[in-house]
A protein has these predicted regions:
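A short local loop/turn or secondary-structure capping micro-motif enriched for an aromatic residue
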Residues: 61, 136-138, 159-162
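Short, surface-exposed loop or secondary-structure junction motifs
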Residues: 1-135
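Short, well-ordered beta-strand elements
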Residues: 3, 129-130, 138-157
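Short, low-complexity, polar/charged sequence segments that are solvent-exposed and flexible
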Residues: 87, 135-136, 147-149, 170-175
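A generic alpha-helix propensity feature with a strong bias for hydrophobic helices
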Residues: 29, 41-44, 153, 166, ...
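Short, gly/Ser/Thr-rich active-site loops of penicillin-recognizing serine hydrolases
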Residues: 99-102, 156-177
Length: 177
């Protein structure tokens, strides 16, 4: 919420409008929205096999109130890592691990956390990623720099184990299957 408030104060605009006008529209992310419950026709979210009633996140601007598609998230991730959204200096700070994390998973390591991005490796490839969740939904948006590839997973069931899905999908995504 702090980032949302900072954006609103610095820009003089509501957070949702600022993101839409300055990031979403210029990148052509037409299937992405900010604030409110998931837009129609979003898949229904589930927890323990039961539907979850969506709620309006607009009052908590900057805290998971962005709804998107895999294609839009992949486009956003590529634009971010190409330096099209922030300065190279800011991108470097974002991707530099400021908080080390120890992880013993061989296929999917996490080595640290930068400013909003986890750092690590996927199947031996350096990677940066950010997971997300809302009641009934999970998300994962990753970037593999040496392949210039985005990897996005969206789930409408809280029981999905993203690392397990990544292990299954990585070989195909990396062209190794």
């Amino acid at each position: 919420m702090l980032v949302g408030l900072i954006v609103e104060r610095a820009s003089g605009q509501p957070y949702a409008r600022f993101l839409t006008e300055r990031i979403l529209a210029p990148l052509g992310l037409a299937a992405t929205s900010v604030g409110g419950p998931p837009p129609e026709p979003a898949a229904r979210g589930y927890r323990d096999g039961a539907p979850v009633t969506p709620f309006d996140l607009a009052a908590m601007a900057g805290t998971g109130d962005i709804w998107s598609t895999a294609a839009d998230l992949a486009r956003f991730t590529a634009a971010l890592h190409a330096g099209n959204l922030i300065t190279n200096e800011s991108l470097h700070a974002m991707l530099t691990p400021h908080a080390p994390i120890e992880d013993d998973d061989e296929d999917l390591t996490t080595t640290g956390y930068g400013y909003g991005m986890f750092t690590g490796t996927f199947a031996g490839h350096a990677a940066y990623y950010h997971p997300g969740d809302n009641p009934g939904y999970l998300s994962f948006a990753g970037w593999i720099p040496d392949l210039s590839a985005s990897l996005v997973i969206l789930a409408n069931d809280e029981s999905v184990v993203i690392p397990d899905l990544l292990r299954k999908l990585l070989p195909a995504a990396l062209g190794e299957s």
